[in-house]
Amino acid sequence: MSFQRDYESEWNAALIEEYGEGGSGFSHGRFASLRMCEQRLYRPPGKVEEGTVKCPGCGSRRVHALQRQTRSADEPMTLFAMCSECGKRWTR
């Protein structure tokens, strides 16, 4: 017998109950407006110097990157990056 809850299923069921069908998790249509706001509001600084982070899309080193602690303190920080050449965004 498992005492672990399936939070992902509960989350998806709550989304469907509240907003109807349209995807699961953060791919649900309810979050589309939040994704658009993030894309409009997040702008890297104008000129980006060549650095140490390499874009997996085009290989450029002109990448705007910042780190934030998104998990517990014993976990590594999360890197949020955006390539100034091709516009690719990723986290690591």
Curated annotation (Swiss-Prot):
PANTHER family: DNA-DIRECTED RNA POLYMERASE (PTHR11239), DNA-DIRECTED RNA POLYMERASE III SUBUNIT RPC10 (PTHR11239:SF12). It comes from the Viruses. Keywords: Elongation factor, Metal-binding, Protein biosynthesis, Zinc, Zinc-finger. GO terms for molecular function: DNA-directed RNA polymerase activity; nucleic acid binding; zinc ion binding. A zinc finger (TFIIS-type) spans 51-91. InterPro entries: Rpa12/Rpb9/Rpc10/TFS (IPR012164), Znf_TFIIS (IPR001222). This is Putative transcription elongation factor S-II-like protein 81R. PROSITE patterns: ZF_TFIIS_1, ZF_TFIIS_2. Zn(2+) binds at C55, C58, C83, C86. GO terms for biological process: termination of RNA polymerase III transcription. SUPFAM superfamilies: Zinc beta-ribbon. The keyword Zinc-finger applies.
